[in-house]
UniProtKB/Swiss-Prot annotation:
Pfam families: TruB_C_2 (PF16198), TruB_N (PF01509). This is tRNA pseudouridine synthase B. The active site is at 39 (nucleophile). Gene3D superfamilies: Pseudouridine synthase. Belongs to the pseudouridine synthase TruB family. Type 1 subfamily. One of its GO terms (biological process) is mRNA pseudouridine synthesis. Responsible for synthesis of pseudouridine from uracil-55 in the psi GC loop of transfer RNAs.
Length: 309
């Protein structure tokens, strides 16, 4: 049985849900969940939680993402990427200055609001935006708070008839639409634009070179080694502070007990989470400050019961 995170190199042409369904069949288990949607046209790092690790999906999803992207200026599209219909056109007749591009990218660093594209899975009034878009209905989209942690130009500008393209890398908070970011970059440079290529190169500290293709995963299943290649739950939670406890306290944590906040976590905020682990590194629960009882910790998520060990 696999209890960990499989690092999938998602191929182009599959939805994230397609990937989950394929792994469910491959591993013959329903306990599979992905950690952040990638559009079908996008490839790259897609962590897949399996077994007990499905309980930590939200914590893995919270991590920052890094992408290598290509933007093409000269025309915009209905989907903000290369798959949509042309919406507006403005030929690029003058060379773009690298200094201007870098200035725009620097300007975009930091916290900001972003309006998700109409062709997206964001829900408004219980329906996904792409359902409205396919029906030709434009609806008001709620702004989302995002953070661009880092963004940098990674290629020279190339020109092709009436368009110009360049590549950039961006590290951003969850929920950021890089294709919308590409449109914003184009606007700031004075041109309609769209995202012409995208690959996710990292999700938190999981990098592309750690990922496996479906073919490799199938071979691991055949060899009986797939569990060995899964990222353990404790490593998947290494962005959370860890509280190491005795086996006696671990048993209480597995039963959902409330604890006094340890001195080293006395300054933790209401939205903070800590991973509670045994001395041998097994994470048994995720704890949070008690909302109504000051000075106490309560379980936000119990990851393991004794019956599962």
């Amino acid at each position: 049985m696999v209890n960990g995170v499989l690092l999938l190199h998602k191929p182009v042409g599959m939805t994230s849900h397609d990937c989950v369904m394929k792994i469910r069949k491959l591993l013959k288990t329903k306990k599979v969940g992905h950690t952040g949607t990638l559009d079908p046209e996008v490839s790259g790092v897609l962590p897949i939680c399996v077994g007990r690790a499905t309980k930590i999906v939200e914590y893995v999803t919270d991590k920052s993402k890094t992408y290598d992207a290509e933007i093409t200026l000269g025309f915009s599209t209905s989907t903000e990427d290369q798959t949509g219909e042309t919406v507006s056109v403005k030929p690029v007749k003058e060379p773009l200055k690298e200094a201007d591009i870098k200035a725009v990218l620097d300007e975009l660093k930091g916290p900001q609001e972003q309006v998700p594209p109409m062709y997206s899975a964001v829900k408004v009034n219980g329906k996904k935006l792409y359902e409205y878009a396919r029906a030709g209905i434009e609806v008001e989209r709620p702004k989302r708070n995002i953070t661009i942690e880092d963004i940098a130009l990674t290629s020279p500008v190339t020109y092709n008839e009436d368009t110009a393209s360049f590549r950039f890398t961006v590290t951003c908070s969850k929920g950021t639409y890089v294709r919308t970011l590409a449109v914003t970059i184009g606007e700031k440079l004075g041109y309609p634009a769209h995202m012409s290529h995208l690959i996710r190169t990292a999700s938190g500290d999981f990098s592309l070179d750690e990922c496996f293709t479906f073919e490799e995963l199938e071979q691991q299943v055949s060899d009986g080694t797939v569990a060995e290649h899964a990222v353990p739950i404790d490593r998947a939670l290494n962005h959370l502070p860890k509280w190491v406890i005795s086996d006696t306290l671990a048993k209480k944590a597995e039963n959902g007990s409330v604890f006094d906040i340890p001195a080293e976590f006395s300054a933790m905020t209401a939205d903070a989470r800590i991973a509670v682990c045994t001395e041998d590194g097994e994470c048994v629960a995720i704890y949070m400050p008690h909302p109504s009882k000051k000075g106490l910790l309560k379980p936000a998520k119990v990851l393991m019961q004794k019956s599962e060990q």
